[in-house]
Amino acid sequence: MMLKPAVDVSWGDYTVTLTAIVGLSKMVQSSDNWDYFINLSASDFPLLPQAELTEVLGRYADAGLSFVEGVPLNEKNRVEVMIDDQGLYREKQTTNAGRSLKVGKPRLPPSESMFTVFKGEFWVILHRSFCEYIEASPDNVARSFQAYFSRFRISDESYFQTVLCHALAPSFPDNLRFVSWPPVSEGHYDLHPDPITRDNVDEAIQSGALFARKFDTEVSKGAYAILKESLSLADPDRLGRAVNRLAPAADVGGREKFCAIPERYSIQEVREIFV
């Protein structure tokens, strides 16, 4: 899905999330002939040919299953300040348009029983039924969370996870990506994964994931050549690895592994958050 005209996006701010929401909404409105919205970055690369990707995901289309990772978010630093994302309203690109401004403290939920914020990755695979739920927001929950996350730092890593859990949508806690994260050192962790190289490309191929990231135009040249050759060959084991990775999703019960909804949670409370 290509959005025209192009829109300004500020890294870490709500315009990243909004662009994805607009994209899936346009898909819902424009065609009935699809089952999954797959959010990819320019540094992603498929590990299966398109026909095999379609076959694997097609096994779960009738169940309405989305593939999303997430955990309850405990970091308060993402919600302690209100973020003014200038990409939302500037008509022209400027030096300041990519900068966010801290303009005060937002109003947080009055109690933890109101709702739980979840954190995962932006790179999700969403079933059409869930995309339709976000686009229409029939109970106003998805729309209310859009308002909440518009002032949330790095909302793209939380919006879909949070809405999916509170909408009780079928899901499996795996976004089906291979990502090579650098080792975590004491008191420090990297925000970006290591590039895929010749050293770890075979690990990516054997992982059963549908996509790998991230690929660097220079560092990943060797890995890219290996993958391109691999995809051109008939390999029955390749499809089998992906099928085996997704096998636990057959029970459609994976959401309980990361959706810890408060016992006293009420959709009505979420609707009234901003009243």
Named regions from a protein language model:
Residues M1-V275:
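ER/Golgi luminal nucleotide-sugar-dependent glycosyltransferases, focusing on the catalytic module
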